[in-house]
Amino acid sequence: MDKNSVIGLVLIGLIMIVWMQFMAPENKPVPERMTADVTGVEETSAKSGTGSPAVAVSAVPETFGEFSAATEGEEKLLTIDNELFTAVLSSRGATLKSMVLKKHLNANRERFDLIKNSDSGALSLFFQTSDGKNIDTRDLYFEPSDTQKTVSLTGEESYTVTYRLDVAPEKSITIVYTFTGDVYGINYDVQFTGFDGVLPGNEYQLEWDGGLLYSEKNIDDELQNSWASAYMGGSLLKLDASDPSKEYREEQSGVAGWIAVRSKYFVASLIPSSPTDGVYLKGSGKPGEKFEDYTAALKFTLPQNEKTHSESLVLFVGPVDYNVLHSLNVNLEKIMDFGWDWLTRPFAEYIILPIFDLLSKLTSNYGLIIIIFALLIKLVTYPLTMASTKSMKKMAALQPMMKELQEKYKDNPQKMQSELGRIYKEAGVNPLGGCLPVLLQMPLLFAMFYVFRSSIELRQQSFLWAKDLSLPDSILDLGFSIPLYGDHIALFPILMGGAVYLQQKITPTAQSNDQMKAMLYIFPVMMLLFFNNLPAGLGLYYLMFNVFSIAQTFYINKTSSADDLPKISLEKQGQKPQKKKKGGKKQ
């Protein structure tokens, strides 16, 4: 790594820290939504087992009106087992009560349930009746079309189950789920019959209620990467409950492409097939625990004078995997944070991830994939590195003349700058020639940081001593925390620090002052501190990038030189250039 790379990467570290700490958009709490939660009631039946407020018998008619009869019933569970997940549906609310992914384990390498609200379920229809009753369908019992308790699916096999709630003659709510054996997406259809004029403004909401359960060991990292969001008008609306003492709310009108709630590596999303009226997002911290709870809802309107109205959606609960999300063709991959949309995101989506996909077809070892990727990047950037090294070699060769010039014109800065420009021009040297190649690589380096920080492909992938390339490769837990360093010792950053030192040592430099000598030691230490708490995959990449840089520098030093510099002389102070007489004699 040359000196300009040193400066560039120092800037990368500083900008990343500032960006992560201070540049996240602030979410301001907004007023309560018009639909208030049902409160102040007592639990009445042990078999209801709800996370939503249950109601005392005497309060049922007052609370639920014509829906009162549906508040009593027997909960019937249905387990759907396909190649990717095991889901549990409940007839109480016709909701999703459990979702366990088969290909992704938690930090203890165990299967885990993504649904936080496992008692009440995650999905609900929420509306207010004309007589002022607030209805959450998770408080109501539906009748399932199938009495099976378990259904297994593989390949393209599909299964449909219908949940029906009869409110009155010719007045009902029907919810239909359709599962397929080899996909994460679940078709979700809701149908209202006889509800025209029953709801104020004919409005209702379809909600995902509750954040996803965390799966990672580093809870602070989970908190940083958890939020609710909506995709509207080609832009991402994001609500992050960053302050646990506040409750955040956001409502917007308009057509939404989707709503979603995510953790670091997993996401739950509702994707409508017809235009919506708006979205509602809510987020807050959980008292006494490190968890951010979120609600995301789509707003719909029942058309007037329409006896039966249906909405079709896709429910997606699965990994934050770029290829999986992109395959849905609804821009759900926009939920992935790749930094600036105008700079680093194109590098991530169109260069880094496609190369990773290609390499993953050659080997399933992601440690090897990272090493090969680092080698490819060095080969691609070789012309830039060569240009940078040659420029610095020329600058180094000019140093004696630069020092002489500075001494000669120390009292005449204007003349000194003029002479510097002349010398650079005659030598064919651009003072910025060493910096420009590094600056051109900055977007790629930034994009690498974001991809390696968020890529689920590295999660729980081991390499050498690193048990998980998405976590620091800790070889020793200290039991206490060192400021700026952390509570553990990671090996890749130590090796990388050594490689950075060696790379600086063998790289030609145009300066040999004490400050640059100090950087030989300061920068490796800075890199050690910065990378100790970053994913091992990122540390491995930069380690190998520097190892290949060392080999590349040895080769360039051996095959190139600054001997082709033209002969350049300094003007003697106070002496004008001499003219020649005719005949070749000097005047």
UniProtKB/Swiss-Prot annotation:
Region (Disordered): 567-587
Ranges that cross the membrane: 5-25, 338-358, 367-387, 432-452, 482-502, 520-540
Positions with biased composition (Basic residues): 577-587
One of the Pfam families matching this protein, by short name: YidC_periplas
Protein origin, superkingdom: Bacteria
InterPro entries (UniProt xref): Membr_insert_YidC, Membr_insert_YidC_N, YidC/ALB3/OXA1/COX18, YidC/Oxa/ALB_C, YidC_ALB_C, YidC_periplasmic_sf
Gene3D superfamilies linked to this entry: 2.70.98.90
Subcellular location: Cell inner membrane
Record HAMAP family: YidC_type1 (MF_01810)
Function comment: Required for the insertion and/or proper folding and/or complex formation of integral membrane proteins into the membrane. Involved in integration of membrane proteins that insert both dependently and independently of the Sec translocase complex, as well as at least some lipoproteins. Aids folding of multispanning membrane proteins.
Protein name, entry field: Membrane protein insertase YidC
Gene, per the UniProt record: yidC
